[in-house]
A protein has these predicted regions:
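Membrane-proximal intracellular helices of multi-pass ion channels
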Residues: 1-247
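Positively charged, low-complexity/disordered segments
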Residues: 249-251
Length: 251
């Protein structure tokens, strides 16, 4: 994408990447002229907030690397849009950015965009529910007799839903950890190993160091490439189908 070197091109593609990271149900509401319901989406607000915060803070962090703040803002916006929507495009090698910006990019790799969109990752809705459930558990520890309810999009969530989110996170972390351990046998540095697994499991594309936008996965061994391919399938199918397929059948 960087070969075009066209600000208009970058902004238009960046905006449309963000649009495809929005829950498609909201577009259905817009078609029905239910504008209030669409714009009141909690997940949409958090999603756009994450994009805005990441773009602005990365811009401030990398401003000294570019000839103007406008160029830094445009560059940060495109990379943030690409990573959070797991599109995988890049106009610069963000592996050369300062540490803060690189860390934000890795976090966005995990978060992903909205549920019901074209994006991979954990999904903003799951992240919201996970943190709300964690806050509820903390409140119960501090106030044992308090009765609290986790609400999402204005509706209370039952224990089955909360348990499903917790189980998904647990399985995700277990698969991530196991994959990192196995990929580390190839002997590459920690950042390369971790981000290679993260970018495959979340279907993003580029990571950091050896698998940065200007790098590739070519140097990994054949068994590791097969493992990363499995991670890509598992992440795209949201873990359960691939894990169930590889599980032994009950007798």
């Amino acid at each position: 994408m960087g070969a075009y070197n066209d600000p208009y091109f970058e902004v238009v593609i960046g905006v449309f990447m963000l649009l495809f990271g929005i829950n498609f149900n909201l577009y259905y509401f817009l078609l029905l002229r239910h504008f209030r319901e669409a714009l009141a989406s909690e997940e949409l607000h958090v999603y756009l907030g994450i994009v805005a915060f990441s773009t602005l803070t990365i811009t401030a962090n990398i401003a000294g690397l570019y000839d103007s703040v406008g160029t830094a803002l445009r560059t940060a916006f495109f990379q943030v849009s690409s990573i959070v929507t797991t599109t995988g495009y890049a106009t610069v090698d963000f592996n050369l950015w300062p540490t803060y910006s690189r860390v934000v990019i890795v976090i966005l790799t995990f978060v992903g965009a909205c549920a019901g969109s074209t994006a991979g990752g954990l999904k903003v809705s799951r992240v919201i529910i996970f943190f709300k459930a964690a806050r509820q558990d903390l409140n119960k520890m501090l106030h044992s007799h308090a009765v609290t309810t986790v609400r999402f999009e204005g509706k209370p969530l039952d224990e089955k839903t909360l348990r499903g989110v917790h189980n998904y996170f647990n399985i995700y972390i277990m698969l991530l950890t196991l994959s990192v351990l196995l990929v580390s046998l190839d002997g590459f540095d920690v950042v390369t190993t971790f981000t290679a697994v993260a970018t495959c499991l979340n279907n993003v594309g580029p990571g950091l160091e050896l698998v940065c936008p200007m790098g590739s996965f070519a140097d990994f061994s054949a068994p590791v490439k097969l493992l990363l391919a499995f991670d890509m399938l598992a992440g795209r199918l949201e873990l359960y189908p691939c894990l169930l397929y590889t599980s032994p059948s009950p007798r």
